[in-house]
Amino acid sequence: MDDWENNDFIQRLDFSSCGEEGEDRSINEEDTLSSSPIKHCDFQKWNSPLPATPHRKLSEIFLSRTKSWVSPTLKSSPGVSRTHGNAETPLHITWKKLQLCDTPHTPKSLLSKTAFPSPGAKVPPKGFRHLRFTPGADLDDSTQASLVNINPFTPESYRQMLFLPNGKRKAREIKLVHLAQSFCEKAEVQRKDSAVRPADRCPLKDSNMVSRYQKEFLELERIGVGEFGSVYKCIKRLDGCVYAIKRSKRPLAGSSDEQLALREVYAHAVLGHHPHVVRYYSAWAEDDHMIIQNEHCNGGSLQDVLLENAKRGQYFPEAKLKEILLQVSMGLKYIHNSGLVHLDIKPSNIFICHKLVVEGQAGQEESDSDDEFSSGVMYKIGDLGHVTSIANPQVEEGDRRFLANEILQEQYFHLPKADIFALALTIALAAGAGPLPHNGAMWHHIRKGNIPSIPQKLPNGFIELLKLMIHPDPMERPSATALTKHPILRPSLGKAVQLQKQLNVEKCKTAMLERELKAARLAQTLMKDQPLGNANLQESETSPKKNNKRLVGGKNCRSFSFTVG
């Protein structure tokens, strides 16, 4: 143990630095690990949370690993407590005294110095340096595919593109083919099932890690409460931006609400980013609770504004109602064109964002903006927990107050028109209509195409549009695309179409005038050249005719002919 006494400075083996260093190197290192299971097992035992190895054996294992790392010329560090005396001192105590075990207070420069040996030291093989603790590293392809959720809203053609090999390595191509087969087989089984079985998807369970929510976010206040859970206004510590963090009330793993939570994540991931849909950033699970990181809308929900208006006896004016209807229709158009349907449109699921314009740049912001909304307010669709596919619907009924009758009758042939129905009732509430009934005679009266009583005077054209949106026959209701082009909501668009028609007529007139002018100029040119042509004609008539015959040989005439064409 003399070497141990003289070299009591133990250089830390930085296994956390085994980052990805390139595709080819990672593949070679994984092959090295799979071909040397003894080293891999020793390393896992040394870091295992199971009861510790006896001290003498542990010291022997450690010395065998670090003998080639420690330089005999290294001096003891003053910051490390020296260990004298009994050689049976547990190694893990000395290890902890180094204070370099990935503590958040250790400078990165110090970690980098202790993570590499001295220039004269012997470098260990790369395979040992890049050992990983991945428990599923030895799983076969089918097992790995079973641990991946299948997004039911992803188009099949796009899902197949995910596993197209790039042709760089045959081993990678073969692995991708096996994964694609397992993945597609699982997707087909899930598509045929009416409900996804808990055993067929990745459960909502954490991995005993430090709370990501507490580590990455600073909670400011609770801004909303719903059936699913609570929404908190938080600042992300890394970028300093404000986000809305949605956390489920109850543990969802294995419960009936788990599918709703996953459906919202699936829909957000597929829809991507649209100015009239609340933006999605991330989602994860902690203690079996689903946590979703979304865009924070600084104006709250439309329901919050309606409650404030009710207290003050106010309601949205006509121009504002048209703007809300138009913007939400744009969001629905994007959702419907993506092959999905929302099925829970109501004031509490429409969120408001006030644009923040820097002073002195208002004119530039207006000129660079692509939209035509001058109020600086954006209305966005959120809460995608009831979203389902139009082609393969798995319908969960939303709020009965906004539910179309065909959904209650389980007639899912025109699902997008159910969103149009709910949007019309949402606009009626914003216009000042009273609370909607959950059932009863008034509920059926509305389903017959009757708009609830609105206290303010609105144009007949706008009222007729709302009535058309709640027509008993869903085929008679306008689509979201038609609403975005409706002349009542976008009169400027109709005016632009009219001006375009007038422009086309004027272009035709201009083209005709140009042709007439060209013909007139051509005729004038011919008139100028006509006297010269007549003089040449008269001269040819008065002049004697020339003999055009050709004499060949003995002054004999030779005739010739030619073909025109």
Swiss-Prot record:
It is found in: Nucleus. The active site is at D344 (proton acceptor). ATP binds at I223, G224, V225, G226, E227, F228, G229, S230, V231, K246. It comes from the Eukaryota. The keyword Transferase applies. Residues 531-553 are annotated as: Disordered. Residues 496-522 form a coiled coil. It is an enzyme of class 2 (transferase). SMART domains: S_TKc. It holds the Pfam family Pkinase. Its EC number is 2.7.10.2. InterPro entries: CC_SR_Kinase, Kinase-like_dom_sf, Prot_kinase_dom, Protein_kinase_ATP_BS, Ser/Thr_kinase_AS, Wee1-like_protein_kinase. GO terms for molecular function: ATP binding; magnesium ion binding; non-membrane spanning protein tyrosine kinase activity; protein tyrosine kinase activity. One of its GO terms (cellular component) is cytoplasm. The keyword Coiled coil applies. Residues 217-493 form the Protein kinase domain. SUPFAM superfamilies: Protein kinase-like (PK-like). It catalyses: L-tyrosyl-[protein] + ATP = O-phospho-L-tyrosyl-[protein] + ADP + H(+). Keywords: ATP-binding, Coiled coil, Kinase, Magnesium, Meiosis, Metal-binding, Nucleotide-binding, Nucleus, Transferase, Tyrosine-protein kinase. Mg(2+) binds at N349, D383. GO terms for biological process: meiotic cell cycle; mitotic cell cycle; regulation of meiosis I. Belongs to the protein kinase superfamily. Ser/Thr protein kinase family. WEE1 subfamily. Oocyte-specific protein tyrosine kinase that phosphorylates and inhibits CDK1 and acts as a key regulator of meiosis. Required to maintain meiotic arrest in oocytes by phosphorylating CDK1 at 'Tyr-15', leading to inhibit CDK1 activity and prevent meiotic reentry. This is Wee1-like protein kinase 2. It comes from Gallus gallus. The gene is WEE2.
